[in-house]
A protein has these predicted regions:
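N-terminal export signals and maturation junctions of secreted/periplasmic proteins
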Residues: 1-10
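C-terminal catalytic core of Y-nucleophile DNA break-rejoin enzymes
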Residues: 5, 71-90, 106-129
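Basic, Lys/Arg- and aromatic-enriched nucleic-acid-binding interface segment
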Residues: 10-39, 43
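Short, Lys/Arg-enriched N-terminal segment that forms or immediately precedes the first helix
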Residues: 12-20, 111-112, 133-136
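Short, basic (Lys/Arg/His-rich) helix/loop patches that form interaction surfaces
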Residues: 20-25, 126-157
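Conserved tyrosine-mediated DNA breakage-rejoining catalytic core shared by Y-recombinases
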Residues: 48-85
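Short, flexible active-site-proximal loops enriched in glycine and acidic residues
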Residues: 98-106
Length: 157
């Protein structure tokens, strides 16, 4: 098994973040990458996020924090939803509204088109790997690279 690498080069990182936003627009995939890069959550925790974790349906607005219990550690975690995440969420939500998808609080954020089941870790890996390859980013890039990239750039600052 290859060890995942962070995306160290800032230009590569910007190109990677923009792949599903500009080169091949796909709001769901863009949100997955932005969430991973901005929260450092494990992919298992990201894929299990539901709309109720990020959106307050009673108030009609995005939450300030994601509060979850991490699958691996069992710890309760609260993570800030920064502007990059909120913009990605908004774009994704608008794309779903345009397709007449009625979002429910219990719906998974990253679900298949016609089912309320989360995409698999393998599918998440494929879309991350594809973006890295198309952006010609060297090194072993995987789902864990999002978490490592967060740590690397936080440490650099």
């Amino acid at each position: 098994m290859n060890t995942a690498h962070p995306i160290r080069n800032p230009e590569d990182l910007e190109q990677f973040k923009g792949y599903y936003q500009y080169q091949k627009p796909h709001p769901r995939n863009y949100l997955l990458i932005i969430l991973g890069l901005n929260t450092a959550l494990r992919i298992s925790d990201i894929l299990n996020l539901r709309w109720e974790h990020v959106y307050d349906f009673q108030m009609g607005r995005y939450r300030n924090h994601i509060s979850i219990i991490e699958q691996k550690t069992g710890k309760k975690t609260s993570i800030l939803l920064n502007q990059n995440i909120v913009r990605a969420l908004s774009w994704y939500q608008q794309s779903l509204s345009g397709s007449n998808k009625n979002i429910q609080p219990q719906d998974f954020l990253f679900c298949h088109k016609n089912e309320n089941v989360p995409i698999s870790r393998v599918q998440a890996f494929r879309l991350i790997k594809k973006a890295a390859e198309r952006c010609q980013i060297s090194g072993t890039i995987s789902c864990h690279s999002l978490r490592k990239t967060f740590g690397y750039h936080a440490w650099q600052q």
